[in-house]
Each structure stands twice: as structure tokens, then as C-alpha cells.
Amino acid sequence: MTKTPKLTDVIEKNRQTINEILADPSTHTRLIDMHWIRDELSAETKILFQYPDYMPQKEKKMYLDFSNIKNLGLAWDHIVKHMNVKTIDNYSIRQIHTILCKDTDIPGGQYRLSEAHIMQLGINAPNYQEMLYRMDDVEYHMKDKRVPVLNRAFNIHYDIIAAQPFNDYNKRTARLIMNWFLISNGYRPILFNKRTDHDDYMKALRARANGDTKTYSHYMYSCMIRTQREIIKRLRKSKVL
């Protein structure tokens, strides 16, 4: 009976394949990879956005401000420009949030000053007076090299969401910081750009909130492998014949 490869082994094999393709001088890397990812982020935002339950279907298309999508692209440009940074700290997190909030009514980069309940996860966020300490914990765990990179990346994503440091755009900030961390450690980012992710993403977060780290991690691994395979497919098409 053939043994099914571990998801982490598949990820490492895909990572090696991507690096080998990118090292090939005959590949038009400028036309793919980071540029394609930037385009897909707008699709991801539309898919993952959790509309208010009361909102009629016909109004949903107008609800998502296109400045939000533009800002997401600008935040991605910032990450690509600083993809080789040695340390991502709390200032970096606030900086990304500031970019996401440009031309909106959300105070960019400012920690919330009121209590928060994460209704979608069924948990209370920490007291706003604890925010500096909670975000220091996020930064500490991000730097803890005793923990494997992928585990740290997934923890960063969830911990920022669970802390709810800002008045809004916490999940977007968490995804971008996770991907920045992955890129700075030699991986490609994770995209949640399939229609099934609208429900599956929140199911995974709820599982993690209930202590089920296995289900959460399996979903994150699966999305990473899916993204890697899409990148490999597109990179191979970019070769000069």
C-alpha cells in the first residue's frame, strides 16, 4: 500500500520545484508569480468578505468599497518591496493596517479603544487595555525559531485575528502579515481565492477558536499546496519555447 505523503513534505517538494523554475533563466518571472498573486488578492477579498446577514443580495455588490481592493494591492506592493526584511514587528503590522485603511473611515494603525466580541468565532477578544501586551506576544512568537516556520505562520494569522487589535480589517491584516512572514522565510504566500473558501475559511477559524488546531492547520496546509500548484502551473507556462 502506498503511503500518503505528509502535507508538509508536499509543501517542501513544491517549494523546491518553484525555486528551480525561478532559477531557470528562460522563465519570464516578471509576468507571473508576485504579479499574479497581487491580482488574485482582489478576488480573495470578494470571496472571503462576510456580508451582514440582513443585507439583500442585490446590495452586496455595492457594499465592498473598491478603495479597499486598491489598498490591498498597495499593501501587497509594500510587502514585495520589503520581502527580505529580517524582522516583522508590531510596527510592521500597524504599517500594513495603515495602508489598508487609506481613504476609509477606519483609523489606520491605531489599536482599538473599546471592547470587542468576535461574533463569527463566538469568542471575546482580549480587553483593549491588554492590546500592547498581546501584540508583543504575537511578535515574540513570530521570532521563536524553536517553532517550525509554517506553524509560526499559521499561529500569527490566528493570533492577530483573535486579538482583534484594530477596529476593522483584522483578518486582512492577519493574512497579509502571515504571507509576508512566509515570503521572508523562503515560501510563497497562501491564497484563499476559491469560492469554497468563503465558508471553509471561517470554519477553519472557528475550529481553531474551539481548540481544534489539527483541522485549522490541515485547511491552511491544503490552501498552501493549492496555491503552490497554481504558481507552478503558471510558471511553467511562462517559459520561452
Where are these regions (language model features)?
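FIC/Doc superfamily catalytic core
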Residues: 1-241
